[in-house]
Amino acid sequence: MKALCWHGKYDVRVDTVPDPIIVDPTDAIVKITATAICGSDLHLYDGYMPTMESGDILGHEPMGEVVEVGSEVTSLKTGDRVVVPFTISCGHCFFCEKTLYSCCDTSNPNADMARKAMGHSPAGIFGYSHMLGGFAGGQAEYLRVPYADVGPIKITSDLPDDKVLFLSDIFPTGYMAAENAQIEPGDTVAVWGCGPVAQFVIQSCWMLGAGRVIAIDRVPERLTMAQEHGKAEIIDFEEEDVYDRLMAMTNGRGPDCCIDAVGCEAHGAGSFDAVLDKAKAALYLGTDRPHVLREAIMCCRKGGTVSIPGVYVGLLDQLPMGAAMNKGLTLKMGQTHVQRYLEPLLEKIEEDQIDPSFVITHSLGLDEGPQAYKTFRDKEDGCIKVVLKP
């Protein structure tokens, strides 16, 4: 089969690789009909994620048709149309029983590797390093899905792929981020970033009762999408000081909730800390660039909440924990427990409360994947979200 494979920093290729096979009796094989490039895939593309190996198959936002099931799979059959969550979860461990699916104790075969870096191992993730399981990803023609009774959700309606594909990751991720923000009716929420996840954060904030949503970015097309589709007020951080503007917009109090939907590759408009972060990364003296998280902590009102769906992979320098502590902030974060949200969010799509396809700007063939990575990474051609059709 054809697959998009990682071969190093900025080096993604279309390779011919063996088709996946049933390994465990709880596996299923899915023929991919649509798959997406995620913003967190760019952390791999940019070389930020350790334990990647040349030839690793990328991708964790897939859907398709079940073509084979293991002998112990009971909920799926050949021909079923499914969306596959990016997290791989067993369904029966301590954490899965608490619906903390991204904390699954069972699904990561390289748990010892993850423990050395994190203290404990999270769940395995498709196409996202050997530290997180070394699983082949979904930017391919076929995908092996472990624990197939636990992960995939069946799509029984005639909704097109583009409307349901993002149940695999970014819609649940945006929704959980808004949920983690502990929004109360009428709250003002500031969202850093206007990429694909942030667009669903914005939509979800309204669903959960926000009174105002303020979106912060510098890319015109992304700000426009946040304003037109997300009905958000916007701040271009290259044109205005974010802290000063947020204070002016909130009568000096600050937003009730701040959401970092950017993560480890944050940019700043020439601020000293942002420049220093980039210099440290260039000299291999640091990993993540936490400018946005610092700014969110400083801007959030006293007693407020900072939600962090943005991905971080290593250590953060000069995080203002004194400000967070003395302001009494709550910080909530984590990989998304996708399986928890699949049914209720699918229901919202089926009831026309939201059409997730609004975020798609580019729909391409799998062979165009390498160029699509570059276009997405460089924010060229108005690119916000790429869907690949094998």
UniProtKB/Swiss-Prot annotation:
It holds the Pfam family ADH_N. Its EC number is 1.1.1.284, 1.1.1.1. The keyword Metal-binding applies. Disulfide bonds: none annotated. CDD domains: FDH_like_1. NAD(+) binds at residues 193-198, 217. It catalyses: a primary alcohol + NAD(+) = an aldehyde + NADH + H(+); a secondary alcohol + NAD(+) = a ketone + NADH + H(+); S-(hydroxymethyl)glutathione + NADP(+) = S-formylglutathione + NADPH + H(+); S-(hydroxymethyl)glutathione + NAD(+) = S-formylglutathione + NADH + H(+). It comes from the Bacteria. Keywords: Metal-binding, NAD, NADP, Oxidoreductase, Zinc. GO terms for molecular function: alcohol dehydrogenase (NAD+) activity; S-(hydroxymethyl)glutathione dehydrogenase (NAD+) activity; S-(hydroxymethyl)glutathione dehydrogenase (NADP+) activity; S-nitrosoglutathione reductase (NADH) activity; zinc ion binding. The keyword Zinc applies. Zn(2+) 2 binds at residues 90, 93, 96, 104. Binds 2 Zn(2+) ions per subunit. Oxidizes long-chain alcohols and, in the presence of glutathione, is able to oxidize formaldehyde. Also acts as a S-nitroso-glutathione reductase by catalyzing the NADH-dependent reduction of S-nitrosoglutathione, thereby regulating protein S-nitrosylation. The enzyme is equally active with NAD and NADP. This is S-(hydroxymethyl)glutathione dehydrogenase. It comes from Methylobacter marinus.
